[in-house]
């Protein structure tokens, strides 16, 4: 199996995993390992590519773009979850101690004696 074939198979496998389990806890770790393996395989490509290998590389690029879109959606979902948790946390703190976050806006100092 050529390096391009291995790269193609790994890319399709990772794309299928992202599509099948977008909320997986191990997705980030798996994707990181995939990127490391892909980088090593890409460094090993040193020969002239055949037409068939060029077509596979075009398919890899298209799949990579689709994975990037899916990962952006997942990232935005995670950001929204983090923001919701932070809002919930601040509301809970304000409820527990409503006089803590006193601001100094509108403070009037009387200079009369």
UniProtKB/Swiss-Prot annotation:
GO process annotations (BP): bacterial-type flagellum organization
The keyword Chaperone is annotated on this UniProt entry: yes
Keyword Chaperone among record annotations: yes
GO CC annotation, single: cytosol
Alphabetized UniProt keyword annotations: Bacterial flagellum biogenesis, Chaperone, Cytoplasm
Entry superkingdom: Bacteria
Subcellular location: Cytoplasm, Cytosol
Subunit structure: Homodimer.
Family assignment from sequence similarity: Belongs to the bacillales FliT family.
Described purpose of this protein according to its UniProt entry: May act as an export chaperone for the filament capping protein FliD.
Descriptive protein name: Flagellar protein FliT
Record lineage: Bacteria, Bacillati, Bacillota, Bacilli, Bacillales
């Amino acid at each position: 199996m050529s390096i391009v074939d291995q790269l193609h198979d790994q890319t399709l496998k990772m794309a299928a995993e992202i599509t099948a389990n977008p909320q997986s806890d191990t997705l980030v770790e798996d994707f990181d390992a995939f990127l490391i393996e892909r980088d090593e395989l890409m460094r090993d490509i040193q020969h002239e590519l055949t037409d068939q290998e060029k077509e596979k590389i075009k398919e890899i690029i298209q799949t990579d773009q689709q994975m990037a879109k899916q990962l952006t959606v997942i990232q935005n979902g995670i950001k929204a979850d983090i923001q919701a948790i932070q809002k919930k946390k601040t509301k809970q703190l304000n409820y527990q101690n409503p006089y803590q976050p006193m601001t100094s806006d509108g403070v009037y100092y009387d200079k009369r004696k």
